[in-house]
From Swiss-Prot:
This is Peroxiredoxin. It catalyses: a hydroperoxide + [thioredoxin]-dithiol = an alcohol + [thioredoxin]-disulfide + H2O. One of its GO terms (cellular component) is cytosol. The keyword Ligase does not apply. One of its GO terms (molecular function) is thioredoxin peroxidase activity. It comes from Archaeoglobus fulgidus (strain ATCC 49558 / DSM 4304 / JCM 9628 / NBRC 100126 / VC-16). Homodecamer. Pentamer of dimers that assemble into a ring structure. Disulfide bonds join 205-211.
Length: 215
């Protein structure tokens, strides 16, 4: 069974374009995004690799690393990365897992039989404790949105640091702007206290169960 939200990322040793690596140990103390792609030398995957590389510094500023994966041999990865450098003048700096036997893909649930035998476009967001915090799947015909993946990483970090929840489209929510959601109270006393804080201007509330604040 593929790992689910809240599970620890499985311990695996992989072959990559940067040599052998042990996951999640290689990224100990960091967030990391593992993303799978269907195949090397394909147009949509090429646009994604360029997009990930162009935003790589933004990920690293969030203490987050990137690592790709597909069921291709490491030689294919290397030649494709060379092609991207030669033709598009983009140097791919993050490692790419060569899962030519499909072992890692099977372990992580990256092959969806109804969509073929290649890996789907999956995204695993893993925190510094090696806990899987988000999983996103895209079909082969749809490339990923870097803004959303970066937003998810940053939002999870803000949530962890402040004990809050993040609204839709944060930080540009239609109701609360760039504010964050205070988790609903779990007792009558806490609900009353919440409304008193709202009256005092410490927080804002639409109702006792829907309160938010700036951070």
């Amino acid at each position: 069974m593929a790992p689910l939200l809240g599970d620890n990322f499985p311990e695996i040793e992989v072959v990559t374009t940067h040599g052998r690596m042990k996951l999640p140990e290689a990224f100990k103390g960091k967030w990391f995004v593992l993303f799978s792609h269907p195949a090397d030398f394909t147009p949509v995957c090429t646009t994604e690799f360029v997009a990930f590389q162009n935003r790589y510094d933004e990920f690293r500023k969030l203490n987050c690393e990137l690592i790709g994966l597909s069921i291709d041999q490491v030689f294919s990865h290397i030649k494709w990365i060379e092609w991207i450098k030669e033709k598009l003048d983009i140097e791919i700096e993050f490692p790419v897992i060569a899962d030519d036997t499909g072992r890692v893909a099977e372990m992580l649930g990256l092959i969806h039989p109804a969509k073929g035998t290649n890996t789907v476009r999956a995204v695993f967001i893993v925190d510094p404790e090696a806990v899987i915090r988000a999983v996103i799947y895209y079909p082969q015909e749809l490339g990923r949105n870097m803004d959303e993946i970066l937003r998810a990483v940053k939002a999870l970090q803000v949530s962890d640091q402040n004990g809050v929840a993040m609204p839709a489209n944060w930080p540009n929510n239609e109701l609360v702007g760039d504010a964050v959601i205070i988790p609903p109270p779990i007792s009558e006393a806490e609900a009353k206290e919440r409304l008193e804080k709202a009256k005092a201007g410490d927080i804002s509330c639409y109702d006792w169960w829907f309160c938010y604040k700036k951070i």
